[in-house]
């Protein structure tokens, strides 16, 4: 019979390390968060062999007093909370007192620290959780923690480490998120002597974004802000033209802590409405400041999952902040820039014959080989080995683009003033709110266009005051019809058109049973089917908005959609129905239209709430400015001075 015993402290720490310290990136995260809590303004992270050989964090924070250094390695010893009430008012990133002892239990840890006003600092060395020495030492104010031979005494953990490149990418990802969370702190990440990431620490979030994503991406991000009595939201989101293939570029922070939250991600997408293409996601860096009492961060070992009170109100604030900022922007993509990116992306490599050329200083100048911009790198498909499949593209972009850090000139640093969330069940009400995006798009200014031609029966050409516009005729009519259907579908108060000859619809037995259950959804959009014999339904009238020639195919399409969905809200059903019908009933490519129809389409487009995107998020029109055209035809050139003018002859 086995007996209950109390585990030795070292074994208990190793068990705790299994939850807190998953990989080298976890060490970096915990130690850097400690440095942030210590009031640091500069943090340097140095790693070797992706952190498995060495992780060293140096900060200029408050430091640790000599008589508290050894205590810091004991479990649940912390300076951040004092009593139970503090657990509900957490303003620091750490609070459990688990990280340092957990790290020390699976590594060789050296800690060098000093506090302001002390005559000397303190050096502590621990191996596998056992303190080997604590001695006075010379040290600047702050703390340096060096973690070596990680997992040396837990070989099973080493067995499951990914490749060094994958582990390094996780570290870059962590540092990037921390840099975005705290733009007032200067972060520097050095791997095997090579600087991988640097932020300026000026307190300007846009500058931190530029240091991580690049200047090109930072320029295409717009500021958002919103607030109520409980929440204050600020940050940046990308314009719809700048997107990524996954959600890894969405960063959410609550009181300076990076979190993952599905519902808030959903709220971000709601704010964009149909301005995003299907399957594409924006870049977003959003800070949320709330009373710590409304957020419970003590629900997960990594503290990345946070329960938020009044989460639905917060979702509404986030989506409104984004929608309001986008409303103020001109969302017509720059055609010349997109063309340049497409050319770079699709260019094929060809074998070139290398001919020896005599270099002439009159015509040639030695230059450094150019590198693709960050935006170009991000748009390439990233191929990973089996060992690196879980690598986030967020970190991969930073890793791949660097040969040396970009040189950015930042303003003089100013101290930033910053303050230090309960998951309800996902119900149909929240889904309804998600689909409000297709019903609240605001009217925008639209250029006056003069139609003058069509190409390949697909694209319309028009001239505006500020250049050339090319319009996708299918996407344009799809947007026009979508807004018509959006307004009319489900308006059961409008008149019904009686049919002289009713339509009979027949379905398989199982489909007929399911349709009977879901018939109220059809009635919500103004379609009333009555049972008529076995597995048959009869339609005696139809809503005015449905053209008579579209009745049979339209009703079957609506029923098919209804049968494919298991649980669906009325708003979702209406939105999807409007999108489906607008797509199927719009003019297709390779279809020529006369000048009158083209001008009428452009007029209808100008009256739309959102004339810039089709319901699937694709652009309706692109814009070449006059300056763009002059650049393409080399009409804009630098001024040249002739040799005669220079007095050479």
From Swiss-Prot:
InterPro entries assigned: DNA_mismatch_repair_CS (IPR014762), DNA_mismatch_repair_MutL (IPR020667), DNA_mismatch_S5_2-like (IPR013507), HATPase_C_sf (IPR036890), MutL/Mlh/PMS (IPR002099), MutL/Mlh/Pms-like (IPR038973), MutL_C (IPR014790), MutL_C_dimsub (IPR042120)
Pfam families xref list: DNA_mis_repair, HATPase_c_3, MutL_C
One GO-annotated biological process of the protein: mismatch repair
Family matches, as CDD domains: HATPase_MutL-MLH-PMS-like (cd16926), MutL_Trans (cd00782)
Keyword DNA repair on entry: yes
SUPFAM superfamilies the UniProt entry points to: ATPase domain of HSP90 chaperone/DNA topoisomerase II/histidine kinase, DNA mismatch repair protein MutL, Ribosomal protein S5 domain 2-like
Transmembrane feature ranges: none
Cysteine disulfide partners in this protein: none
Key words of the record: DNA damage, DNA repair
Domain of life: Bacteria
Gene3D superfamilies membership: 3.30.230.10, Histidine kinase-like ATPase, C-terminal domain, MutL, C-terminal domain, dimerisation subdomain, MutL, C-terminal domain, regulatory subdomain
GO CC terms of this entry: mismatch repair complex
GO terms for MF: ATP binding; ATP hydrolysis activity; ATP-dependent DNA damage sensor activity; mismatched DNA binding
The keyword DNA repair is annotated on this UniProt entry: yes
Family: Belongs to the DNA mismatch repair MutL/HexB family.
Function: This protein is involved in the repair of mismatches in DNA. It is required for dam-dependent methyl-directed DNA mismatch repair. May act as a 'molecular matchmaker', a protein that promotes the formation of a stable complex between two or more DNA-binding proteins in an ATP-dependent manner without itself being part of a final effector complex.
Protein name listed in UniProt: DNA mismatch repair protein MutL
Gene name tied to this protein: mutL
């Amino acid at each position: 019979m086995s007996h209950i015993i109390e585990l030795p402290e070292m074994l208990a720490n190793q068990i705790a390390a299994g939850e807190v310290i998953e990989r080298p990136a976890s060490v970096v995260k915990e130690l850097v968060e400690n440095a942030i809590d210590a009031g640091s303004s500069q943090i340097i992270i140095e790693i070797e062999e992706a952190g498995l050989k060495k992780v060293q964090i140096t900060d200029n924070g408050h430091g640790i007093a000599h008589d508290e250094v050894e205590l810091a390695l004991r479990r649940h010893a912390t300076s951040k909370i004092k009593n139970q009430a503090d657990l509900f008012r957490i303003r620091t990133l750490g609070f459990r007192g688990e990280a340092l002892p957990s790290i020390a239990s699976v590594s060789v840890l050296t800690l060098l620290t000093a506090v302001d006003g002390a005559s000397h600092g303190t050096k502590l060395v621990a191996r596998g959780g056992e303190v080997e020495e604590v001695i006075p030492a010379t040290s600047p104010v702050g703390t340096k923690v060096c973690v070596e031979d990680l997992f040396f005494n837990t070989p099973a953990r080493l067995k499951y480490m990914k490749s060094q490149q994958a582990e390094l990418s996780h570290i870059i990802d962590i540092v990037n998120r921390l840099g975005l969370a705290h733009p007032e702190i200067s972060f520097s990440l050095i791997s095997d002597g090579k600087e991988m990431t640097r932020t300026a620490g000026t307190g300007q979030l846009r500058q931190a974004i530029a240091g991580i994503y690049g200047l090109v991406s930072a320029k295409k991000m717009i500021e958002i802000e919103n607030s109520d009595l409980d929440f204050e939201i600020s940050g940046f989101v990308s314009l719809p033209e700048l997107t990524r293939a996954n959600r890894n570029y969405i960063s959410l922070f609550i009181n300076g802590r990076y979190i993952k939250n599905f519902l808030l991600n959903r709220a971000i997408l709601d704010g964009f409405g149909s301005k995003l293409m299907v399957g594409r996601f924006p870049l977003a860096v959003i800070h949320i400041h709330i009373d710590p009492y409304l957020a419970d961060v003590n629900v997960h070992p990594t503290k990345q999952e946070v329960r938020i009170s009044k989460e639905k109100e917060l979702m509404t604030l986030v989506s409104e902040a984004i929608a309001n900022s986008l409303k103020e922007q001109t969302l017509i993509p720059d055609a010349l820039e997109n063309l340049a990116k497409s050319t770079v992306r699709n260019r094929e490599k060809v074998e070139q014959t290398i001919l020896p050329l005599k270099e002439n200083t009159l015509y040639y100048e030695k230059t450094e080989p150019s590198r693709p911009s960050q935006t170009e790198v991000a748009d390439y498909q990233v191929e990973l080995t089996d060992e690196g499949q879980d690598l986030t593209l967020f970190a991969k972009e930073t890793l791949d683009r660097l040969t040396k850090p970009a040189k950015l000139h930042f303003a003089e640093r100013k101290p930033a003033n910053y303050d230090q969330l309960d998951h309800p069940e996902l119900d149909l009400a929240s889904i309804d709110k998600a689909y409000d995006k297709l019903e609240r798009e605001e009217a925008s200014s639209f250029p006056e266009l003069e139609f003058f031609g069509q190409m390949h029966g697909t694209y319309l050409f028009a001239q505006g005051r500020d250049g050339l516009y090319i319009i996708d005729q299918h996407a344009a009519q799809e947007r026009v019809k979508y807004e018509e259907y959006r307004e009319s579908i489900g308006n059961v108060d409008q008149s019904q058109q009686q049919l002289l000859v009713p339509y009979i619809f027949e379905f398989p037995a199982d489909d007929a049973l399911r349709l009977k259950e879901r018939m109220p959804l059809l009635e919500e959009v103004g379609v009333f089917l009555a049972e008529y014999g076995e597995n048959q339904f009869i339609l005696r009238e139809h809503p005015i908005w449905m053209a008579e020639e579209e009745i049979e195919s339209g009703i079957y399409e609506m029923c098919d959609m209804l049968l494919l969905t298991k649980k669906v809200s009325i708003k979702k059903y209406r939105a999807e129905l409007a999108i489906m019908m607008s797509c199927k009933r719009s003019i297709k490519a390779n279809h020529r239209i006369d000048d009158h129809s083209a001008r009428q389409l452009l007029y209808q487009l100008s009256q739309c709430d959102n004339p810039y995107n089709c319901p699937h998020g694709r652009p309706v029109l692109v814009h070449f400015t006059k300056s763009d055209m002059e650049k393409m035809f080399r009409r804009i050139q630098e001024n040249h001075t002739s040799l005669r003018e220079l007095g050479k002859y």
